[in-house]
């Protein structure tokens, strides 16, 4: 029986913090316990925010933390052709359509409505969809207006039917076991933009398949996004990994530790004399 394959996939748009350490260590410990392999992937598809110095810091921090990975490092920025092939396939199957509305356009439309506007699991207003009239933009958008390609969710679900995935961790509400996917909750998600070959959802699904990942271990804030990933796997005929979502570390205000809220970086803790064993204790106590 082939060895299980896990992966840790940070984005080099800032320094790693305790939340990243939790995810890296959970992946490392689970891979070791299963006599499996741990891969390292750098999710740098957003070249406007990702920087080489942050990638170098990630490698340094993981080495200091004692997290060892197998094989080379896959960088999304070097594999645009892999994602473009998938986008082209979905276009050829009439599952994608061009969309010119911006997030602010959609938010403005949602604010004009009298009834509550539907929102995705992250709280973002849903796009009107392929079959609903769009009142804010002219039929022919102005020059230079960037287009996105959205998934026709209704048509995609009609092709795949009901989908499920196996959860060995727990979602935000304690969801575990066999989970029914609910991709419809996300509406017509953007899968490609003018300046990006593919969205996070496409890139992560393609990468996991090409790298032979059998176990996806990540924070429970991505639990509901798994429904989109499960749908793409079905549309593309890809193997479905086992999913394991772990808890998040929160700050004093109850918010998820993140780069945007300036969570203390691992390198700062290291400079203060904190050891890798201390990091494990801090995580256990959080």
Q: What kind of region is each of these model predictions?
A:
Residues 104-257, 265-270:
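Active-site cores that bind ATP or allylic diphosphates and position pyrophosphate for catalysis
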Residues 70-72, 240-243, 277-279:
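Short, surface-exposed acidic
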Residues 1-15, 33, 38, 65, ...:
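Non-catalytic terminal extensions that flank enzyme cores
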């Amino acid at each position: 029986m082939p060895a299980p394959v896990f992966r840790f996939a940070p984005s080099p748009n800032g320094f790693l913090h305790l939340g990243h350490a939790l995810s890296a260590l959970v992946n490392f410990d689970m891979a070791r316990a299963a006599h499996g392999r741990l891969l390292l992937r750098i999710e740098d598809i957003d070249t406007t925010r990702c920087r080489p110095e942050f990638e170098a810091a990630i490698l340094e921090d993981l080495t200091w933390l004692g997290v060892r990975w197998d094989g080379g490092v896959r960088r999304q920025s070097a594999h645009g052709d892999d994602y473009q092939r998938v986008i082209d396939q979905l276009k050829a199957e009439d599952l994608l359509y061009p969309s010119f509305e911006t997030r602010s356009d959609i938010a403005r439309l949602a604010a004009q409505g009298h009834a509550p506007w539907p929102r995705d699991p992250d709280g973002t207003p849903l796009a009107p969809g392929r079959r609903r009239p769009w009142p804010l933009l002219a039929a022919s958008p102005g020059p230079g207006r960037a287009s996105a390609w959205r998934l026709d969710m209704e048509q995609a679900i009609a092709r795949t039917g009901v989908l499920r995935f196996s959860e060995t961790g727990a979602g935000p509400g304690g969801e575990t076991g066999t989970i029914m996917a609910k991709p419809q909750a996300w509406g017509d998600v953007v899968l490609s933009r003018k300046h990006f070959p593919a969205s996070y959802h496409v890139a992560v699904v393609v990468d996991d398949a090409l790298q032979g990942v059998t176990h996806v271990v990540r924070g429970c804030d991505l639990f509901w996004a798994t429904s989109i990933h499960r749908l793409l796997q079905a549309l593309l005929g890809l193997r479905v990994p086992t999913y394991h979502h772990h808890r998040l570390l929160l700050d004093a205000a109850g918010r998820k530790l993140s780069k945007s809220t300036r969570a203390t970086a691992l390198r700062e803790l290291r400079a203060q004399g904190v050891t890798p064993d201390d990091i494990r204790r801090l995580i256990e106590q959080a």
